[in-house]
Amino acid sequence: MFSWSYLMGLVMVATATLSLARPSYNIAEDTTLEPEEPPTKYQISQPDVHSALPGESVELRCLLGDAIMVTWTKDGAQLVSNNRTLLIGPYLQIREAAPRDSGLYACGATRPLQSETRYFIVNITDGNSSGDDEDDNDGSEDFTNDNNHKRAPYWTNTEKLEKKLHAVPAANTVKFRCPAGGNPLPSMRWLKNGKEFKQEHRIGGFKVRSQHWSLIMESVVPSDKGNYTCIMENEYGSINHTYHLDVVERSPHPPILQAGLPANTTTKVGGDREFVCKVYSDAQPHIQWRHIELNGSKIGPDGNPYLKVLKAAGGNTTVKEIEVLYVRNVSFEDAGEYTCLAGNSIGISYHSAWLTVLPDEERQLDSSSSEYTEIAIYCVGGFLIACMIGTIMMCHMKGRGKKSDFSSQPAVHKLSKRLPLRRQVTVSADSSSSMNSNTPLVRITTRLLSNTDTHLLAGVSEYELPEDPKWEYPRDKLTLGKPLGEGCFGQVVMAEAVGIDKDRPKDAVTVAVKMLKDDATEKDLSDLVSEMEMMKMIGKHKNIINLLGACTQDGPLYVIVEYASKGNLREYLRTRRPPGMEYSFDIFRIPEEQMTFKDLVSCTYQLARGMEYLASQKCIHRDLAARNVLVTETNVIKIADFGLARDINNIDYYKKTTNGRLPVKWMAPEALFDRVYTLQSDVWSFGVLMWEIFTLGGSPYPGIPVEELFKLLKEGHRMVKPGNCTNELYTMMTDCWRAVPSQRPTFKQLVEDLDRILTQTTNEEYLDLNNPLEPYSPSYPDTRSSCSFGDDSVFSPDPMSMNLAFPNPNTQMAPLKHEATQPA
């Protein structure tokens, strides 16, 4: 009896051992099916090999000398920058690497008439995983089994079966999944084009992941095209699903230009011609049209070619549009050689053609007769104009004779005309809203001019402004210089003002002068006067653009303000980005000044002081942004345009401005949706301005369309922490972006906190080159039409509105090197 019990125990143990070993045996069998990756057509003899573990960073450097253009590809597909992959010229950085980042990387350096390519092999491996199933986080769910009753096979995740057609480039990895369930657990087999799919049917074989119900084929080729059917079956039934695979062949070659194009052509002066250049390229081509002027030689006296770039792909220009070059109203200067230059990541190709210009003989013969015709036309036209002027003057004289009550008045008449100049940017003592105070500032009187008055702006009557002795400046001591730009109400020019500084009565001081344009309207004059009066009332402060004087008498209105030689803050920061961070082919350019972390904190502190002063004067800015902040020669930060009169009821926030920026990106939700402007809405804008500073002039909410931005702001999403920013400063930003205005800090609190941070910051904390900055492209606006909440998201949830903790700093931008020494 004892021997039989002992024998049965051994049988049960052996049976249990076999049942437990069977899954392990299947998995081991799967791993034996993994072939070595065959060499692809992109590989060379000795590529650089880089290995890393998941979650680590990978950096590739491609230094191939002076290159016009450097492009990066992965497995033959061109790469673009995103939140995990950063491309800066010859540098490629992959943050938080995953197994799907493994592959063959290539950098191509393009030069005139030649190109060079360097290759890298990146392996992201984990000892516990093959790397094929990094996105199969729900694999355990696929094996859910109902032990209570038997059941035929069924699909457990129909969403993974929705995409039936898969079109991929050659050399990519393809994975088909058929997650199923059943009791007993169904078996899986695969068919290709209706026949059993075996390892020997494909060079390199394939992988079957039974635990994830998947079929994996690496480095696909055109012969892999076809229908792939998964069959799930057990003793109670079977189900199947079919995928269709289409493999697009990629060809690594420089652009191919159609023979015979562009073609030589001849035309006469004044004619129109076009050159056509047909470009065929698998990779994205870059096309340029160049003109070598006809002067007997391609080389000028300075040793440089007479070369001019006429047209280049960029912005919203398509390849089809750039393939045609139009030369209209041809002159002799247009003669010469025209070259179509096309390049991609593999190399450069070009074709040239000649334009010959001949004199227009018919035009020369007709020139004499046309001159007589023009003279006759001018004479007749002049006579008719003289008759019209005479008739108008006679009617005017008769009308004046009838109105005897005006006959005794002098040549200059004064008509009382009150313009609605209101303090739209001030607030009352009991409210912080900018829409409550409507006190008129100044009374302007129009003046009808006699015939002797000549200095009259087109479209605007000449006005008599009341003289203010405190601010009036002699017009003869002001020397106007070059234009600085156009503002809201007119134009701004540089000038020299003698004696405007009371401490230096004999010295000339460089100032900026605001004046109306030639086509200014009465509203433009009203707005300029309103801004001048507002600046008078606000007074002076170190961190705002101060009013120095005005010329209001005996001539056009000149408003004299301080001059900031280094321009607006946004461009000031962008030109001082570390080498390699700006959008430029020359990544080794030395920035104008080496910025430190303390410089950025000091800039933020000065802005907070300026806004604290404006808030104390009950002034609401309503357009606080880096583009409206100026920098002086001594790097003093000054807030500008705080006195502008804006019609807040008629702004179309859905239209882009002329320079492509959307003002909604700096506006608080209550200002955006309810048109309520308060000091708290300025605090929100200050938080966005801080984000601009610590991204060195980055564009807020990059790639987010306006309609999506409205939705995301309402849902409580906010931008993530910039790379050159500590956790403490980012907390200050998010406090400024509180959904409830009363929960945001005041400018006084911001000044106190920034003063404390500034005193704890050393001068040696230079910006880290490895920290990613927002890409800056002056020609290419963001074109993404949707946002992602994955790695590409630029938002993080608002802790107040979403009841979530702050985003983990370890999963966002890389911190600065000095962050460990700062309070966080």
UniProtKB/Swiss-Prot annotation:
Q: Where is this region: Disordered?
A: 125-152, 801-824
Bilayer-crossing regions: 375-395
Q: According to its UniProt record, how is this protein modified after translation?
A: Autophosphorylated. Binding of FGF family members together with heparan sulfate proteoglycan or heparin promotes receptor dimerization and autophosphorylation on tyrosine residues. Autophosphorylation occurs in trans between the two FGFR molecules present in the dimer. N-glycosylated in the endoplasmic reticulum. The N-glycan chains undergo further maturation to an Endo H-resistant form in the Golgi apparatus.
What is the recorded membrane topology of this protein?
Single-pass type I membrane protein
Cystine pairings recorded for this chain: C62-C107, C178-C230, C277-C340
Q: How is its activity regulated?
A: Present in an inactive conformation in the absence of bound ligand. Ligand binding leads to dimerization and activation by autophosphorylation on tyrosine residues.
Taken from the record's topology, the Cytoplasmic segments are 396-824
In terms of CDD domains, this protein maps to: IgI_2_FGFR
Localization per record = Cell membrane; Golgi apparatus; Cytoplasmic vesicle
What is the annotated signal peptide range for this record? 1-21
The free-text function statement in the UniProt record for this protein reads: Tyrosine-protein kinase that acts as a cell-surface receptor for fibroblast growth factors and plays an essential role in the regulation of cell proliferation, differentiation, migration and apoptosis, and in the regulation of embryonic development. Required for normal embryonic patterning, limb bud development, lung morphogenesis, osteogenesis and skin development. Plays an essential role in the regulation of osteoblast differentiation, proliferation and apoptosis, and is required for normal skeleton development.
Q: What is known of its domains?
A: The second and third Ig-like domains directly interact with fibroblast growth factors (FGF) and heparan sulfate proteoglycans.
Its recorded name reads Fibroblast growth factor receptor 2
Tell me which species this is from. Pleurodeles waltl (Iberian ribbed newt)
Tell me the classification of the organism that encodes this protein.
Answer: Eukaryota, Metazoa, Chordata, Craniata, Vertebrata
Chain's gene name: FGFR2
